Amino acid sequence: MLPFVQNIPMISIWLCVLGGLCCLMLRAHAAKILSLLMCCTQVVLSAVILTHTLYAGASFNYQMGHFASPFGNELRAGPLEALLALCISVVMLLSLMGGADDLKLDIPENKRSNYYIMTSLVFAALLVIIYTNDIFTAYVFIEIITLGACAIIAIKPGGRTLVATMWYLIMSLIGAGLLLFSISMLYGVTGHLLMPGLYESVAVLAATGQYTLPLFILTGLMCAGLGIKCALFPFHSWLPGAHASATTASSSILSGLVVKGYIFLIIKIFVRVYGIQVMDMLHITDILLILGVFGLLFGFSSSY
């Protein structure tokens, strides 16, 4: 039997899902209280995992179901994952608390419970992206984030909000298509979806020189897909409209959590799927450096 602390990642995810389902049956004020209590509980649970992993000095895997790796699915929790989960929980709590007054002005009372349902689903999906050890599971919950993010934008009445939501949805679907295509290509050349298996297979392919061109192409598609979803340069122009049209709490969640969740997934894939040596061999780091410099110059020139 696993120690209780190793069950916390799964408990945290299901807590958000169940909290969202409970909000479906509650009035606006009760749904707000439940969401805030859920966020506070997540802060405590994430702090427990962080303390445990720091003192243990190692991460742990949580096997989902009866099938072990590489056939089953699993979660992975270490100090970095626990710290990010703690930060996400705190930001979500502060966003809902800070934007509570504006929600009363921007959203009709009969729709506010729906708002808290969507924020709970976004919260759960972000935790899955942090903890998952499976790249396809990350893709599935990225789409849940997309649907939840569109909902918390569109729930504010107004034509401008609907236009911004449609732009957000269209660009997110383009990014999702590129990401799914790259994941299917990666599965085709490696035969794995779990990150440890992908890391070993990619290292072998890089060492033997096999599938170098497909590996380079799928990496570019993956970066482009996630870059579009998190509005990295040069795919940034569509995002400000969505943030400006949303309510205060939604804008805070989108900019402080959703975008950062995609960026964390990019870093996670680079480190735990490719590794620094393979990235250097494929010149991915050089391309990222060039794009970063151009983004810096573009941002500097656009500020005037």
Model-derived segments and their meaning:
Residues M1-L21, I129-A149, T212-G220:
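Alpha-helical transmembrane segments and their immediate interhelical/interface regions
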Residues L84, N114-Y115, E143, I287-L291:
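Short acidic-aromatic active-site loops that bind/stabilize oxyanions
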Residues M1-I11, L18, C22-I117, P196-A203:
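Transmembrane helix-loop-helix hairpins at membrane boundaries of multipass inner-membrane proteins
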Residues W14-H29, L147-V163:
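Cytoplasmic juxtamembrane interface segments
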Residues G65-F67, G72, I144, L173, ...:
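Short linear sequence elements within intrinsically disordered, low-complexity coil regions
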Residues L94-K104, L121-F136, G148-Y304:
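Hydrophobic transmembrane alpha-helices and their helix-loop junctions in integral membrane proteins
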Residues W14-C16, V43-V44, I144-T146, I228-P234:
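Amphipathic repeat-derived elements
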